[in-house]
UniProtKB/Swiss-Prot annotation:
This is ATP synthase epsilon chain. It is found in: Cell inner membrane. One of its GO terms (molecular function) is proton-transporting ATP synthase activity, rotational mechanism. InterPro entries: ATP_F1_dsu/esu_C_sf, ATP_synth_F1_dsu/esu, ATP_synth_F1_dsu/esu_N, ATP_synth_F1_esu_C, ATPsynth_dsu/esu_N. GO terms for cellular component: plasma membrane; proton-transporting ATP synthase complex. It is a peripheral membrane protein. Keywords: ATP synthesis, Cell inner membrane, Cell membrane, CF(1), Hydrogen ion transport, Ion transport, Membrane, Transport. The lineage of its organism: Bacteria, Pseudomonadati, Thermodesulfobacteriota, Desulfobulbia, Desulfobulbales. It comes from the Bacteria. Produces ATP from ADP in the presence of a proton gradient across the membrane. F-type ATPases have 2 components, CF(1) - the catalytic core - and CF(0) - the membrane proton channel. CF(1) has five subunits: alpha(3), beta(3), gamma(1), delta(1), epsilon(1). CF(0) has three main subunits: a, b and c. It comes from Desulfotalea psychrophila (strain LSv54 / DSM 12343).
Amino acid sequence: MAQQINLEVVTPSGSIINKDVDIVNAPGSGGDFGVLANHAPLLSTIKIGALTYEIGEERNTLMVSGGFCEVSNNKITFLVESAEAKQDIDTDRAMKAKIRAEKRIAKHGLPSDEAYSDTRAEAALHRALIRLRVAQGL
């Protein structure tokens, strides 16, 4: 059996995953990256995206919100705002959030004081799209 790395994903609610895995692929703010056992120490910010990990032939995916990642001593720890496993994603809710965000973005001529709302709508759309992608196993 190949050497593994310990993966831990922590949200404000607590640790949701703590297991040994073969490989982790993460949505880093500077680009996606992969981590295997014995990886060099690393700190990275994490963007909204799909976090995947493999154990043997089994591949698992989580939707994660922004946060941080540390790789050290054969352990990779994610401190993220939220994390949802494929089976926990409510696709109806995600689709409604997608439609709502698209409607907000489609509004033209927003006053400058509403620019922040537009940015929030874009972030909401991105989260909804990632949730749908993870739920569909893409």
